[in-house]
C-alpha cells in the first residue's frame, strides 16, 4: 500500500522516505513525458492550461511539496481502492462499546486510514490546494493527536485535533458537554496557551520535516486567525438540541469545533467520490 506508517517514526505517513529518497531517473523521465504531453495539448488547443497531476509519479509530487512525508492528495487514497472497506471497518470500530480513543488512533495510523482524519478539512475552507497530516505532533510538553495543515487562496491554516473516548461520558442528561468533551476542551486550552506563548519554539520542529530551505511566512509569523482546534468524542446518539447549540457556540466563541465520531465516518464516505478535501 502507498499509505503505510513506518514503525517507530509516527510522523512519516509512508513506507518510502520521500525526503531522503529523491525521485529516481525513471520517475523523472515519466514526469517529464507527462509535462511534454501537457504542453502539446495546450499547443494544439491554443489556450488554457492542461494539468495531469494525477499521473505524476508520487515521488515527484511528494518531493516537491513542503513536507514530503506528510503530504496527502485525495486521489491517492481513492486510487488505493479500499476507502469504502476502511470506512466500514471504522464505523464498526467506533460503534463497538469496548473501543477507546487509543484504538481509534491505532486504526487510523496503522491500518492506515489517514483519509478519515483528513475528512476534518471538509469543515473548513482550506486544504483543497495543498494538504498535510502530522500524527502525534509535539507542542512543548503536550502532544496533539493530529495536526492538519491545509492551503487555500489565502495561504496555509492549521487544525489541531484531539480524539477523546467514543463511548465515554460524552454528554450529560441535559445534552450539555460531559466529562469527555470537557477533558478534550481543557487539553485544547493548554495547546492554545503553549502556541501563543511559545509559537517559534512550538513550530521550529516542523522545519525538520521539510526539504525546503524556507517555509511560507504562516509558519514563522503567528496569526491566531489561522489556527483552529477540534475535539472528537462520542457518537451521534449522544447529541441532542442542547449539544448542537453548545457546538455552535463553541465554534463562534472559542474557535473549537466539536465533532462526534459519526461525523468522521460521514466525511470519510463523502471523500470516496469527492474532488478535493
Regions found by a protein language model. Name each.
Residues 1-277:
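Charged, terminal alpha-helix-loop-beta segments
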Amino acid at each position: 500500500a502507498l499509505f503505510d506508517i513506518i514503525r517507530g517514526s509516527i510522523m512519516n505517513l509512508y513506507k518510502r522516505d520521500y525526503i531522503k529518497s529523491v525521485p529516481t531517473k525513471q520517475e523523472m523521465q515519466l514526469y517529464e513525458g507527462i509535462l511534454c504531453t501537457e504542453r502539446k495539448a495546450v499547443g494544439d488547443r491554443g489556450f488554457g492550461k492542461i494539468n495531469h497531476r494525477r499521473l505524476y509519479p508520487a515521488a515527484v509530487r511528494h518531493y516537491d511539496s513542503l513536507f514530503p512525508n506528510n503530504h496527502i492528495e485525495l486521489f491517492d487514497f481513492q486510487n488505493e481502492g479500499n476507502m469504502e472497506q476502511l470506512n466500514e471497518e471504522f464505523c464498526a470500530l467506533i460503534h463497538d462499546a469496548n473501543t477507546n480513543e487509543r484504538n481509534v488512533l491505532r486504526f487510523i495510523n496503522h491500518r492506515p486510514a489517514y483519509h478519515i482524519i483528513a475528512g476534518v478539512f471538509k469543515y473548513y475552507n482550506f486544504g483543497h490546494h495543498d494538504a498535510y497530516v502530522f500524527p502525534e505532533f509535539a507542542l512543548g510538553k503536550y502532544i496533539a493527536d493530529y495536526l492538519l495543515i491545509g492551503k487555500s487562496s489565502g495561504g496555509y491554516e492549521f487544525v489541531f485535533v484531539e480524539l477523546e473516548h467514543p463511548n465515554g461520558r460524552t454528554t450529560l442528561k441535559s445534552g450539555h458537554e460531559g466529562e469527555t468533551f470537557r477533558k478534550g476542551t481543557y487539553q485544547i486550552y493548554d495547546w492554545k496557551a503553549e502556541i501563543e506563548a511559545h509559537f517559534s519554539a512550538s513550530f521550529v520542529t516542523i522545519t525538520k520535516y521539510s526539504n525546503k530551505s524556507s517555509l511560507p511566512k504562516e509558519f514563522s509569523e503567528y496569526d491566531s486567525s489561522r489556527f483552529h482546534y477540534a475535539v472528537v468524542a462520542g457518537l451521534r446518539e449522544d447529541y441532542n438540541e442542547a449539544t448542537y447549540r453548545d457546538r455552535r457556540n463553541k465554534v463562534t466563541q472559542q474557535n473549537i469545533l466539536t465533532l462526534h465520531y459519526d461525523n468522521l465516518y460521514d466525511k470519510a464516505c463523502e471523500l470516496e467520490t469527492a474532488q478535493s478535501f
